[in-house]
């Protein structure tokens, strides 16, 4: 008997309060690594009405004007009018940054393996910046090997921001959220149940002053300018039963940091797989590559995507775990949920052979320290909104499938 169910994922725009914080945090990462690629950074940001607080720990040779950096990013996002409750030029920016704890630094600078004379391998030099568990996922639901619900939700959010920025829908304001419920039948996406868009907007639109008229105009415009263009090249289309909800509270004029406080690292499911895969709990933004919450999660995605791209599984989840100050992973797990084409133990052996999963190895393989300088001073801030994975609009090293053929070759050698 077939099983029919719904799965829902959400996304938020770059103007969402939490995403403002993520982007400022990662702009700090970009700037510090651009000037000093050995920078150690844990940058947290809080925003509220008229206020930005930058706090955390930074050890770097770079000299950065954090106040100016934050204002520029806020303006780029679109908060330039104080009448909207938050503006780049008028908000207060407070900076309270300390140096990285020497107790933590010693374990990162010289890993347990070298301190105990267990190894002289260069890649054993850097210890994990913290303990923790990280997950990565890939599946064959979309060309970018991402789950369809989060893929569509991000596309709607990016399109929503685009029509605001181009002026096509000039009455839109920066804050917004999207949500998509996909119909599955026996694990395969077959339809769209609900599309939800909540978007901040002007009080009136042209000559339309009553709220009912404003909401009707927004709903019609979003269907034509956001939903239809996104779905144009998607195989699954809305049906007559598909619900399209816009601003279900009835109004969304007060938004951004005036409507809700924002904090770095509060959109970890939006950043990853939309709840479709497990999550270790660690956020990405504001962390330099020695923090395995970030770098190892990227490595997990890299491994999982190459396994699926190689045709070795239809779905794959990879888990890594680390101990603070220790270079080598505590554990590595490869799970294919019954869709694997080869023995999972042999697949795990191939992963261990082909992928370097020590922090220094991940940093080196994915070039995580040099990316900001190679990309003109901005890299991490661009993945801080609209997802860190499955980004066809960005050239992300962990999205490469260069190991797929090598995985198949390695498994052929052992007779799989």
UniProtKB/Swiss-Prot annotation:
Q: What is its main location?
A: cytoplasm
Name the keywords, alphabetized.
Answer: ATP-binding, Cytoplasm, Magnesium, Metal-binding, Nucleotide-binding, One-carbon metabolism, Potassium, Transferase
What biological-process terms (Gene Ontology) are attached?
Answer: one-carbon metabolic process; S-adenosylmethionine biosynthetic process
Q: Tell me which cofactor or cofactors this protein depends on.
A: Mg(2+); K(+)
Question: Whom does it interact with, and what assembly results?
Answer: Homotetramer; dimer of dimers.
Q: Which family does it belong to?
A: Belongs to the AdoMet synthase family.
Q: Provide the binding site for ATP.
A: 16, 175-177, 251-252, 260, 266-267, 283, 287
Transmembrane ranges, per UniProt, are: none
**For binding K(+), which residues are annotated in this chain's numbering?**
44
Cofactor note (record): Binds 2 divalent ions per subunit.
Q: Function of this protein?
A: Catalyzes the formation of S-adenosylmethionine (AdoMet) from methionine and ATP. The overall synthetic reaction is composed of two sequential steps, AdoMet formation and the subsequent tripolyphosphate hydrolysis which occurs prior to release of AdoMet from the enzyme.
The superkingdom of the source organism is Bacteria
Reaction(s) catalysed by this chain's protein: L-methionine + ATP + H2O = S-adenosyl-L-methionine + phosphate + diphosphate
Q: In which pathway does it act?
A: Amino-acid biosynthesis; S-adenosyl-L-methionine biosynthesis; S-adenosyl-L-methionine from L-methionine: step 1/1
The record's subcellular location field reads:
Cytoplasm
Checking Pfam families in the record gives:
S-AdoMet_synt_C (PF02773), S-AdoMet_synt_M (PF02772), S-AdoMet_synt_N (PF00438)
> This chain belongs to which protein, by name?
S-adenosylmethionine synthase
